[in-house]
Swiss-Prot record:
Gene transcribed to yield this protein: GRIN3A
PANTHER family the UniProt entry points to: IONOTROPIC GLUTAMATE RECEPTOR (PTHR18966)
Binding site for D-serine: S633, R638, S801, A802, D845
Protein name, UniProt field: Glutamate receptor ionotropic, NMDA 3A
Coiled coil regions in record: 1058-1109
Disulphide connectivity of cysteines: C537-C575, C543-C576, C859-C913
Organism from which the protein derives: Homo sapiens
């Protein structure tokens, strides 16, 4: 109300200040554009207005000890406000309606006799405001984004209303009809209302409303406590009664009697003046019914002794002729008292059947002291005052919406806005709208709303029918048998009293139920196997798989199964076992009931499809099954139509993928070490080789020309050879370094290579076997699922809770995955394991997926990602089933006593594939595909070797001649001894030829006594060269030392002095070493000359032989 006042004040200010308000309103976001008719919408202000009159609060009168048929029912009480004060409503912000309990008709005597009840006030104004607020939140109720407004009349003593600031509260209502008409015109009709809602409380006010509707041609809906009799049938004036129609109770009671073929009945009245006219008329119109006695115990109720004596006589007289007794006008206290007295003193004939004819409140129903087989009917929830007000307002809104689609101008623009100019010739908007009011039906808050005849708005409630029976524990319990909808009874699964004889095979004992249980195959909760040759199950429960959900077919199959002549085809028989079957057997044992088990015909859990529920849910709703036991997920949609027990198994949704054993690719042998490690190893190798070379050439003891006058040289290529040999473990001849630093560094490199090689070898086997790759999904929010690309395929089971979750949470994802959904979980697993696979990922309950992973012999399945959509498995039951509470209690006991843990260990104790110990042969048995990379590497090596050979020839023929011509590039000994020889080959050959031609001359010039010694004073490399053996005339190559003949110095020349460790010269040692070295060189020369002499002698012999042979031939 305060919010409406603020908006009215803002509108008035905007009228005074047009320019600023225009700027303010320009910033308000505009609503969506209206297609048509824009001019009409602008004229009516984008609102449909409904007037309201007779808004005085209703005060319910206290009930008398003896009720008339139109008395109101006692419900939840409210304190009546003090005179002159207003009740302050406190609605919940998210509530759809405000609950003010209506006093409807109920069993009399719910209070003590003579005790009054406090009066209660009902406030029509508040109910109207909340009805408008709730209906404006309903999308699509009115077309063109129209809103609903209420225009309330101003009544004396109620104060001014913000919706009508221009009206004066001082205008009192007159008692005569003409003054009332004038007041309605001046305060309500001028606002352009489409209809009027009224709350009359007397016959005179009803006549005033008749006058208003006839004169102004405006539809009026009167909300009354009970129907007022009317002589005229005015189609513009409708009345909606808050009282439950007596005819509804009569119809339900007659339907119950007809359903059970109880045509012979008697009546028992607790109140003499109770109205049973409608019931008697219905039974008299049907020739099958026969009314016996009418037992009126009104006068005998106060005295127990009188009541006992009277009932004993009456009940004995009717037990044979009319065994059915219908009770009217009795509250629960009186009913209990009657049955307690008759049972205590043994005057209750056991063959009597009892029916309560009055509607009962389910919350007031008790079982103590009541006989088994008692039938009652009533509503689970009681309608309240605000429900009827909102339904009346919605009736107007729906009629306007329908009329607008045909003639918008006539439906939206009221014809009567000035009472002085009433349209009488043409069709008015009120007359046009009344046609649609009479043909509008919908399901409202108070019941099914429709117009009966031409003046009555009927709110038909759906009644439930209960029967007092034994529960599985042997205790009395109210069991729902069915419901009364649309004038007929819709049966539930409960057993009607007269139908017990038709279910002899199902009920062998009155206290032991025989239920029909439906299941669905889902491992490990339900397995199936074939029956034996005799059609029996050595282990597990016998179940039928008839491939249908037709109740009559199942009845005939089970009847045949339990008969002596079993004609059920063997193909329909299966043996069911598993987690849920064990649980079902335990529940049946503890609750003492038998059951027949069958597999759901369509193989679905259940979903709303083509206007009905399928699968397990559909079988429960149609009464085909009394219980559904399998991995039945509890979700919101299913819980709204069926009952679930408390969860016996908690799970969530998961994602299943397939792992693929990939053969090691070409570069797999390098996978044990990261590429950064490989790079580091080869960089360290070459750095080590560089430092080895530097240390060796800088050391005085190194294997270099300057070191110890060695015949071999340690170059950079030698260092690389050592480093690679140590890294890869080659056993080849190498030239190790001679200096201490080089050897230390070489050993350090060997340690480094040992650790690298051991790490590589340790990881090589696992890598070469092949890596298991799979689709990496983080969960349901993974981009691969929300934005699938490159043919990524994923799905779930059709009509399962997983599909329902995806459809509600991610509609776009559901639309994509529909093409990949599968009929059942085994199909999805098979699609993953196929080669090639038909699915890349499968979404389903994680409990089912974990089991599939654990039994996968090939270890190809894996669950990935975070679990999502936590849910539980429960046992499904029909709505309002009496078994729900008992089974839930048993499940709680099973959990606390460890039975559920035992079931889990029994059916889930399978070694997970990831924890299996593989055989050694399975791991190390590798084929050529695992080493394909090494073979490729070897082939690449062959190719590179060919390229290297070609490169050598190119270097030898093109590059070396150019290097030889450059004097600065002649020395390559530090890099490669072989390269150095190749570059200096021409120089050595010239020296060798020069030595061969002149050595005889040199030796002939030496005197006989002259000692020829070599000049050893110069220790440089130029005077120490190797002899290169030539390949002349096919002889073997021998290396000799070539040096330049230098004239010997005087024998007394002082040798250069060398410093020893003590600082003195040691010339004796130097000369001694030089002589020994020269002697060894001379011995080598003698050996060479000797070989040449041998060759010369051999040649001479050959020539002489040749000469002798030639002479012989000439002669």
């Amino acid at each position: 109300m305060r919010r409406l006042s603020l908006w009215w004040l803002l509108s008035r200010v905007c009228l005074l200040l047009p320019p600023p308000c225009a700027l303010v309103l320009a910033g308000v976001p505009s609503s969506s554009s209206h297609p048509q008719p824009c001019q009409i919408l602008k004229r009516i202000g984008h609102a449909v207005r409904v007037g309201a009159v007779h808004l005085q609060p209703w005060t319910t009168a206290p009930r008398a000890a003896s009720r008339a048929p139109d008395d109101s029912r006692a419900g939840a009480q409210r304190d009546e406000p003090e005179p002159g004060t207003r009740r302050s409503p406190a609605p919940s912000p998210g509530a759809r309606w405000l609950g003010s309990t209506l006093h409807g008709r109920g069993p009399p005597g719910s209070r003590k006799p003579g005790e009054g009840a406090r009066a209660e006030a009902l406030w029509p104004r508040d109910a109207l405001l909340f009805a408008v607020d709730n209906l404006n939140r309903v999308e699509g109720l009115l077309p063109y984004n129209l809103s609903l407004e209420v225009v309330m009349a101003i009544e004396a003593g109620l104060g001014d209303l913000p919706l009508l600031p221009f009206s004066s509260p001082s205008s009192p209502w007159s008692s005569d009809p003409f003054s009332f008409l004038q007041s309605v015109c001046h305060t309500v009709v001028v606002q352009g209302v489409s209809a009027l809602l009224a709350f009359p409380q007397s016959q005179g006010e009803m006549m005033e409303l008749d006058l208003v509707s006839l004169v102004l041609h405006i539809p009026v809906i009167s909300i009354v406590r009970h129907e007022f009799p009317r002589e005229s049938q005015n189609p513009l004036h409708l009345q909606l009664s808050l009282e439950n129609s007596l005819s509804s109770d009569a119809d339900v009671t007659v339907s119950i009697l007809t359903m059970n073929n109880w045509y012979n009945f008697s009546l028992l009245l607790c109140q003499e003046d109770w109205n049973i006219t409608d019931f008697l008329l219905l039974t008299q119109n049907n020739s099958k019914f026969h009314l016996g006695s009418i037992i009126n115990i009104t006068a005998n109720l106060p005295s127990t002794q009188d009541l006992l004596s009277f009932l004993q006589i009456q009940l004995e007289s009717i037990k044979n002729s009319t065994p059915t007794v219908v009770m009217f006008g009795c509250d629960m206290e009186s009913i209990r008292r009657i049955f307690e007295i008759t049972t205590q003193f043994g005057v209750m004939p056991p063959e009597l059947r009892w029916v309560l004819g009055d509607s009962q409140n389910v919350e007031e129903l008790r079982t103590e002291g009541l006989p088994l087989g008692l039938i009652a009917h009533g509503k689970t929830t009681q309608s309240v005052f605000e429900h009827y007000v909102q339904d009346a307002m919605e009736l107007v809104a729906r009629a306007v919406a329908t009329a607008t689609m045909i003639q918008p101008e006539l439906a939206l623009i009221p014809s009567t806005m000035n009472c002085m100019e009433v349209e009488t010739t043409n069709l008015t908007s009120g007359q046009y709208l009344s046609r649609f009011l009479a043909n509008t039906t919908f399901r409202g808050l108070s019941g099914s709303i429709r117009v009966k005849g031409s003046t009555i708005v009927s709110s038909e409630n759906n009644f439930f029918i209960w029967n007092l029976q034994h529960d599985p524990m042997g205790k009395p319990m109210w069991t729902r048998l069915g419901s009364w909808q649309g004038g007929k009874i819709v049966m539930d699964y409960g057993i009607w009293p007269e139908q017990a004889q038709r279910h002899k095979t199902h009920f062998q004992h009155p206290s032991k139920l025989h239920l029909r249980v439906v299941t669905l195959i889902e491992h490990p909760f339900v397995f199936t196997r074939e029956v034996d040759d005799e059609g029996l199950c050595p282990a597990g429960q016998l179940c039928l798989d008839p491939m249908t959900n037709d109740s009559s077919t199942l009845d005939s199959l089970f009847s045949s199964l339990h008969s002596s002549n079993d004609t059920v085809p063997i193909k329909f028989k299966k043996c069911c076992y598993g987690y849920c079957i064990d649980l079902l057997e335990k529940i049946a044992e503890d609750m003492n009931f038998d059951f027949d088990l069958y597999i759901v015909g369509d193989g679905k859990y259940g979903a709303w499809k083509n206007g009905h529920w399928t699968g397990l849910v559909g079988d429960l709703l149609r009464g085909t099954a009394h219980m559904a036991v399998t991995s039945f997920s509890i979700n919101t949609a299913r819980s709204q139509v069926i009952d679930f027990t408390s969860p016996f198994f908690s799970t969530s949704l998961g994602i299943l993928v397939r792992t693929r054993d990939t053969a090691a690719p070409i570069g797999a042998f390098m996978w044990p070490l990261h590429w950064t490690m490989w790079l580091g190893i080869f960089v360290a190798l070459h750095i080590t080789a560089v430092f080895l070379t530097l240390y060796e050439w800088k050391s005085p003891f190194g294997l270099t020309p300057k070191g110890r006058n060695r015949s071999k040289v340690f170059s950079f290529s030698s260092a690389l050879n050592i480093c690679y040999a140590l890294l890869f473990g080659r056993t080849v001849a190498i030239k190790p370094p001679k200096c201490w630093t080089g050897r230390f560094l070489m050993n350090l490199w060997a340690i480094f290579c040992m650790f690298c090689l051991s790490t590589y070898t340790a990881n090589l086997a696992a890598v070469m076997v092949g890596e298991k790759i799979y689709e990496e999904l983080s969960g349901i929010h993974d981009p691969k699922l929300h934005h699938p690309s490159q043919g990524f395929r994923f799905g779930t089971v059709r009509e399962s809770s997983a599909e329902d979750y995806v459809r509600q949470s991610f509609p776009e994802m559901h639309e994509y995955m529909r093409r990949y959904n599968v009929p059942a979980t085994p199909d999805g697993v098979e699609y993953l394991k196929n080669d090639p696979e038909k699915l890349d990922a499968f979404i389903m309950d994680k409990a089912l997926l974990d089991y599939e992973v654990s039994i996968d012999a090939d270890c190809k399945l894996l669950t990935v990602g975070k679990p999502f959509a936590i849910e539980g498995y429960g046992i499904g039951l029909p709505p309002n089933s009496p078994l729900t509470a008992n089974i839930s209690e048993l499940i709680s006991q099973y959990k606390s006593h460890g039975f559920m843990d035992m079931l889990h260990d029994k059916w889930y104790r399978v070694v997970p594939c990831g924890k299996r110990s593989f055989a050694v042969t399975e791991t190390l048995q590798m084929g050529i595909k695992h080493f394909s990379g090494l073979f490729v590497l070897l082939c690449i090596g062959f190719g590179l070797s060919i390229l290297t050979t070609i490169g050598e020839h190119i270097v030898y023929r093109l590059l070396l001649p150019r290097i030889k011509n450059k004097s600065k590039l002649q020395y390559w000994l530090h890099t490669s001894q072989r390269l150095h020889r190749a570059i200096n080959t021409s120089f050595i050959e010239e020296k060798q030829q020069h030595f061969k031609t002149k050595r005889v001359e040199k030796r002939s010039n030496v005197g006989p006594r002259q000692l020829t010694v070599w000049n050893t004073s110069n220790l440089s490399h130029d005077n120490r060269r190797k002899y290169i053996f030539s390949d002349e005339e096919g002889q073997n190559q021998l290396g000799i030392r070539i040096h330049q003949d230098i004239p010997l110095p005087p024998r007394r020349r002082e040798l250069p002095a060398l410093r020893t460790t003590n600082g003195k010269a040691d010339s004796l040692n130097v000369s001694r070493n030089s002589v020994m070295q020269e002697l060894s060189e001379l011995e080598k020369q003698i050996q060479v000359i000797r070989q040449e002499l041998q060759l010369a002698v051999s040649r001479k012999t050959e020539l002489e032989e040749y000469q002798r042979t030639s002479r012989t031939c000439e002669s």
